[in-house]
Amino acid sequence: MIKQALISVSDKSGIVDFAKSLSDLGVKILSTGGTAKLLADAGLSVTEVADYTGFPEMLDGRVKTLHPKVHGGILARRDLPEHMAALEKHDIPTIDLLVVNLYPFVQTVSKEECSLEDAIENIDIGGPTMLRSAAKNHRDVTVVVDPADYAVVLDEMRANSNAVSYKTNFRLATKVFAHTAQYDGAITNYLTSLTDELQHSSRNTYPATFNLAFDKVQDLRYGENPHQSAAFYRDLSVPAGALANYNQLQGKELSYNNIADSDAAWECVKTFDVPACVIVKHANPCGVALGADAHDAYAKALQTDPTSAFGGIIAFNREVDEAAAQAVAKQFVEVLIAPSFSAEARQVFAAKQNVRLLEIALGEGHNAFDLKRVGGGLLVQSLDSKNVQPHELRVVTKRHPTPKEMDDLLFAWRVAKFVKSNAIVFCGNGMTLGVGAGQMSRVDSARIASIKAQNAGLTLAGSAVASDAFFPFRDGLDVVVAAGASCVIQPGGSMRDDEVVGAADEHNIAMVLTGVRHFRH
């Protein structure tokens, strides 16, 4: 039975109403600092923890609740006579309900101007200590770390003479340990990220222990396949341009595959500064184009592979206006992503309520690491964020690319980074002409890319080709030249580079090397 509660929260949403309801149920309220003032100003009878313990807050508030009268009242087992006798001897009442959430460490370190000093001051000490004490003694103490649980606790108290069930206490305690683990992990990750800087080291040091913490956004209907269960989680610190920040304007619930493909499309389209459209199917771009506006870019992107675009994901880096919306509405599309949709575009899609419209701000989308699970382990690497500049390219053939060819090569190279390896991409005039993806041999990707262009009725004469990794033999080069390519961009680095460059000279095409590989698995 809950007779006394201690409330100390950073997130004050709903706390006044919750405390009023507790008071109406006859529960005495202890509190600290800003929370105590808020509750008192709302007309509630509140006892400051400093008055309760007889010991003042000290060290600029660093020591508030670290006192035996607080932790004894939380940790004492009510079923052990010796524990209760100890409380009586030292005049320590029980604390039956603890309502605490922690200093906003993650929000603090997410700010660009955050200093190490700011971060340190936002490491909560008393809060986690009380939470862990209450969660450990969950048989006797109800502990609430999430405002979403206020209503559940009140409903049970009202129905059971101020008592909360063991089942609920156990669930809330489990939530606490997940929360404190997440909190400590965020602190560890932040401090680890500063290690090299503080040691004046340029090494890319990875932590000895890698902590992951994500909040669940929603359960999904199923995973990659219907027999797999799934859920979507959001990083604690989400960059402004991340897919996880989407605002869904309309449409059915997103599926596992929708989310994965949407991320691929969104990250690709954001790499372009001019109006662009990216169409993705099964995590691979099947059409990418630049245009005068969203409508123009979409019309070009669709030409690459209209068959594969059916039921795909479409992303724009400009507002979708009425013209673009009317064009897209003519085909079956799963998800449409853009920084914004005009009112007229929204009206067009109002007649197609199953189409999922996602608004996401332009900006950085991923944090520092790329993660991949393997059996019993985790692969961690930095993001593939390298974009080569024209001055970094090395022309290795007798013929140099023309300015137009160089523009097409750089466009093709940017697209190839987002195509599953082995990747071959034909481009021309700011649009993809044929995409060969995910083949075990590079020459097969080249053949598929040329076939795709042929099927779409697109000419490859004078086209530019990007290969995400080097040509191990000249055969792949021979295929793209036979299809019509006049220039090629690739990393180089093969034992047979001389043979491949010689073949390029033999065909009188231009070849540039990036020195950068873009494998994507």
Swiss-Prot record:
<dbReference type="InterPro" id="IPR002695">
    <property type="entry name" value="PurH-like"/>
</dbReference>
<feature type="domain" description="MGS-like">
    <location>
        <begin position="1"/>
        <end position="145"/>
    </location>
</feature>
<dbReference type="GO" id="GO:0006189">
    <property type="term" value="P:'de novo' IMP biosynthetic process"/>
</dbReference>
<comment type="pathway">
    <text>Purine metabolism; IMP biosynthesis via de novo pathway; IMP from 5-formamido-1-(5-phospho-D-ribosyl)imidazole-4-carboxamide: step 1/1.</text>
</comment>
<dbReference type="Pfam" id="PF01808">
    <property type="entry name" value="AICARFT_IMPCHas"/>
</dbReference>
<comment type="pathway">
    <text>Purine metabolism; IMP biosynthesis via de novo pathway; 5-formamido-1-(5-phospho-D-ribosyl)imidazole-4-carboxamide from 5-amino-1-(5-phospho-D-ribosyl)imidazole-4-carboxamide (10-formyl THF route): step 1/1.</text>
</comment>
<keyword id="KW-0808">Transferase</keyword>
<comment type="similarity">
    <text>Belongs to the PurH family.</text>
</comment>
<dbReference type="InterPro" id="IPR024051">
    <property type="entry name" value="AICAR_Tfase_dup_dom_sf"/>
</dbReference>
<keyword id="KW-0658">Purine biosynthesis</keyword>
<dbReference type="GO" id="GO:0003937">
    <property type="term" value="F:IMP cyclohydrolase activity"/>
</dbReference>
<dbReference type="Pfam" id="PF02142">
    <property type="entry name" value="MGS"/>
</dbReference>
<keyword id="KW-0511">Multifunctional enzyme</keyword>
<dbReference type="InterPro" id="IPR036914">
    <property type="entry name" value="MGS-like_dom_sf"/>
</dbReference>
<dbReference type="InterPro" id="IPR011607">
    <property type="entry name" value="MGS-like_dom"/>
</dbReference>
<protein>
    <recommendedName>
        <fullName>Bifunctional purine biosynthesis protein PurH</fullName>
        <ecNumber>2.1.2.3</ecNumber>
        <ecNumber>3.5.4.10</ecNumber>
    </recommendedName>
</protein>
<keyword id="KW-0378">Hydrolase</keyword>
<dbReference type="InterPro" id="IPR016193">
    <property type="entry name" value="Cytidine_deaminase-like"/>
</dbReference>
<dbReference type="GO" id="GO:0005829">
    <property type="term" value="C:cytosol"/>
</dbReference>
<dbReference type="GO" id="GO:0004643">
    <property type="term" value="F:phosphoribosylaminoimidazolecarboxamide formyltransferase activity"/>
</dbReference>
